[in-house]
Structure formats: C-alpha cells, structure tokens
C-alpha cells in the first residue's frame, strides 16, 4: 500500500512540543532557584522574579475567588484545539503561518498545564527600565506574543484571494 505524503503543516507541532518543554523546564527551574517576590538581577534591565499569576495577562482577574482559573484554563484548551485544527488545514509551505500557530499552541498549552497542576501560572521574567517594570511573564507568554506577531505580519503581507 502506497501512502501519499501529507502536504499539511502537522510537522510544525514539534515546535509546540518544544515550547511546552522549554516553558515547563524554565518554570521548574524558577520555582526551585528563585524566592517568591525576590528579584535576581540578570542584566541592568532584566530580573528573574518569581510570581504566581491566578489571572491572565497583566494579572487580569487575578484577585477573583477562583472561577477565573477554570475560565482561563478552558479558554486555553479551546483556543489550542481551534489552532490545531487551523494548523491541520494549513499548507506546509505557509511557513510564517505555521510557525505562528505552533508558537501560540505551545504557549497556550504551557500555561494550561500550569493552571491544571497548580491553579496559577508561574511567571518570572521581569523587564524594567529603572523603577518601571513591565508585567512579569514566562516562556509560554513570549511564544504566544511572537506567534501572534507572526500571524499578523503574515496576514498583512499575504495577498487575499478574495475579490
């Protein structure tokens, strides 16, 4: 029996798995070598500061009584399924789209794992300029941001086939 080689972007899911592994490893290391709320200076503009986020980006809804954990876990899971289906219908030749989708999937599932295991997401990357600090984030958040950026660029640069 001869099988036809798939031209779909499924092989890009390896990148999602790599993002999940790097995210979970970095969070494991942060939890074992950092103390909650105590910054470790890496560069003049970068600290590693362990924080636990029960909300979403910028700790949105982080002070609620717990329902938000299930809510954000469900959103992460549903969005990941949707993006996996989108990736399954994407041509392997659409590299920027495949790369963006894979990064977002890996990031969303990395944070999903944290929410299921701990009821919070571990954040530790702390960029700052003097006393102004950006929201503390993690590898999964970075992958999501880069993935969204790539999708936006792809959509802006790719001519639409619609009239």
Swiss-Prot record:
Its main location: membrane. The active site is at residues 123, 141. It is a multi-pass membrane protein. Signal peptide: none annotated. One of its GO terms (biological process) is proteolysis. It holds the Pfam family Peptidase_A8. Pathway: Protein modification; lipoprotein biosynthesis (signal peptide cleavage). The keyword Transmembrane helix applies. Its EC number is 3.4.23.36. The chain crosses the membrane at residues 9-29, 42-62, 67-87, 93-113, 137-157. One of its GO terms (molecular function) is aspartic-type endopeptidase activity. Keywords: Aspartyl protease, Cell inner membrane, Cell membrane, Hydrolase, Membrane, Protease, Transmembrane, Transmembrane helix. It is found in: Cell inner membrane. One of its GO terms (cellular component) is plasma membrane. It catalyses: Release of signal peptides from bacterial membrane prolipoproteins. Hydrolyzes -Xaa-Yaa-Zaa-|-(S,diacylglyceryl)Cys-, in which Xaa is hydrophobic (preferably Leu), and Yaa (Ala or Ser) and Zaa (Gly or Ala) have small, neutral side chains. Belongs to the peptidase A8 family. This protein specifically catalyzes the removal of signal peptides from prolipoproteins. This is Lipoprotein signal peptidase. It comes from Coxiella burnetii (strain Dugway 5J108-111). The lineage of its organism: Bacteria, Pseudomonadati, Pseudomonadota, Gammaproteobacteria, Legionellales.
């Amino acid at each position: 029996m001869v099988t036809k080689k798939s031209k779909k972007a499924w092989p890009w899911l390896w990148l999602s798995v790599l993002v999940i592994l790097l995210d979970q490893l970095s969070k494991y290391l942060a939890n074992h070598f950092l103390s909650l709320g105590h910054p470790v200076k890496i560069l003049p503009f970068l600290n590693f500061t362990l924080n636990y986020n029960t909300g979403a980006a910028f700790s949105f809804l982080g002070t609620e009584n717990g329902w938000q954990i299930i809510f954000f876990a469900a959103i992460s899971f549903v969005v990941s399924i949707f993006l996996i289906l989108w990736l399954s219908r994407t041509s392997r030749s659409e590299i920027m789209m495949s790369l963006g989708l894979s990064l977002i999937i890996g990031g969303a599932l990395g944070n999903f794992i944290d929410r299921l295991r701990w009821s919070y997401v571990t954040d530790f990357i702390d960029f700052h300029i003097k006393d102004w600090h950006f929201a503390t984030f993690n590898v999964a958040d970075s992958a999501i941001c880069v993935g969204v950026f790539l999708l936006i660029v792809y959509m802006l640069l790719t001519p639409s086939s619609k009239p």
